[in-house]
Amino acid sequence: MASVDVQNLRKIYKRDSQDIIVLDGMNLQVPDGEFVALMGPSGSGKTTLLNCIAGIDRPTSGTVTVGGSDVTSLSEGALAKWRSRHVGFIFQFYNLIPVLTAVENVELPLLLLTNLSKKQRRERALTALGVVGLADRAKHYPRQLSGGQEQRVAIARAIVTDPDVLVADEPTGDLDAKSAEDILNLMETLNREFKKTIVMVTHDPRAAARAHVERHLEKGVLTASVSRREAVVGTV
């Protein structure tokens, strides 16, 4: 079963009474456990597609199904609740709250899960920091961390609810080469060892090369696909 299933997705914005077509009948399937990179020039629809998958934006028409849930049919309240449980967000800029420690930042998504005690929230946040290799930085504030460490905290925050899908928008775009490499290694580990489905937008071919599949977009449609799984099979 596809973890993400996008069918006939269209997204149209109005600008000065003109229709701006951002997604034009998009179809995309991402199997459970797949790591997919979305590439294309600016304005090709990559981030809009990612936002529709994550339930941040609503399409004009078409359907988005994630983990068996039809995201496009949910009310605003139900959609917010669904996002908090089933999607983990990783952004180019880390969006950490500067007055909170690393572990407190990671705990934030858990505040929406009312069935957890304070102790359980703290334990899960510490576990997530351990997964990203920052258990020893739990009490550090963002200003005391490097950019790569801040992004690791942001990734811990993304995985702390054990979401069905991780959506990443240019996760290495604000990092130096070494930190970017470390973050991509971590994302590969989350995919391979923790079986996380990942949909990542990137302009960087080196980042895209870590994914199982590259999907190329232009003017709101998929124009090409590169599967590294097939390439590996073909060389055996």
Indicate residue ranges for each PLM-predicted region.
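ABC-family P-loop ATPase nucleotide-binding domain
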Residues: M1-I12, T223-V236
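ABC family nucleotide-binding domain
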Residues: A2-L217
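H-loop (His-switch) and adjacent beta-strand-loop-beta switch element
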Residues: E214-V226
